[in-house]
């Protein structure tokens, strides 16, 4: 039998390759804040962080997936299998799941990293082999059932896997934590995918329906060439696009856009707006302060904005900017932030009273 680590060893979180130190720092900070002891086990460019904690099952609901910034996915580790036999990977997994409850679905995954991506074929083939074995053992429903825990097997190489569990209500609903979004030909720029992903990731379906309604009024600061403006028009919002640069003509032709040639960093509306969005290349602290001014002055009710992170101490800068924003906003707000799949050296922030 393959060696097995002790079950319930910690949390496994997937992230963008190269951002393991930021995720490790965030997990350490959030766990300590919640009163849990633990430590991060990771290597740069692995694309994941294992946060070792004896009380992982109790810690998981305290670290909500939607509130974690650098985690694409959050899983509770049931077992680590570091020396699997390629001739029989299924038997040791069934053995560690002998006392586990029935699961509503199975996802077999790998980190989104240089070492992890070549494992996609193994993950797909192994999932097809493991599903019938789990069903025969009474451990997996015939059809996906989101009311039951979801089983994850995460391969980090061909003979090393983590067997994990996720709460479907508190985890990413996409394999690898990556939403599959298609860039439509009419999108003015790839940045449109950022705002599409932000709306999917930072808001629940119920919140999206309540907060992104046709007829709402929005401002897009630093709008050119119009990627984020275009996304807002697809929500049937009326948009003030603020930029000295040009917008794509087909964005203007929607009839929902007014292009104002001005500096998006200094412009503000005469009347309060429902939404403000901003994806400007500027120092993150300056952006955080300007976004706070918008809320303090009552110029918008909801906002989505990007913070471009420095090359070093990115977790420290993230905390500083978000604290600065909340201190200066002058009102209680729900603030959620994520490093999205379509983000690069940046995070995307939602701020809203959510009511």
From Swiss-Prot:
Q: Which UniProt keywords apply?
A: Cytoplasm, Methyltransferase, rRNA processing, S-adenosyl-L-methionine, Transferase
**Active-site residues from the entry:** 308 (proton acceptor)
- Gene Ontology molecular function: S-adenosylmethionine-dependent methyltransferase activity
Compartments annotated for it: namely: Cytoplasm
State the reactions this protein catalyses: cytidine(2498) in 23S rRNA + S-adenosyl-L-methionine = 2'-O-methylcytidine(2498) in 23S rRNA + S-adenosyl-L-homocysteine + H(+)
Which cellular components does GO assign to this protein?
cytoplasm
Q: What is its EC number?
A: 2.1.1.186
- Please give a single GO biological process term from the UniProt record: methylation
Instruction: Please state what class of enzyme this protein is.
Output: transferase
Q: Which residues bind S-adenosyl-L-methionine?
A: 191, 224-227, 243, 263, 279
InterPro entries under this entry? RlmM_FDX (IPR040739), RlmM_THUMP-like (IPR048646), RNA_MeTrfase_FtsJ_dom (IPR002877), rRNA_MeTrfase_M (IPR011224), SAM-dependent_MTases_sf (IPR029063)
The family assignment reads: Belongs to the class I-like SAM-binding methyltransferase superfamily. RNA methyltransferase RlmE family. RlmM subfamily.
Q: Which PANTHER family match?
A: RIBOSOMAL RNA LARGE SUBUNIT METHYLTRANSFERASE M (PTHR37524), RIBOSOMAL RNA METHYLTRANSFERASE FTSJ DOMAIN-CONTAINING PROTEIN (PTHR37524:SF2)
- Give the protein's function: Catalyzes the 2'-O-methylation at nucleotide C2498 in 23S rRNA.
**Subunit field text:** Monomer.
NCBIfam families for the chain: PRK11760.1
What name is this protein filed under? Ribosomal RNA large subunit methyltransferase M
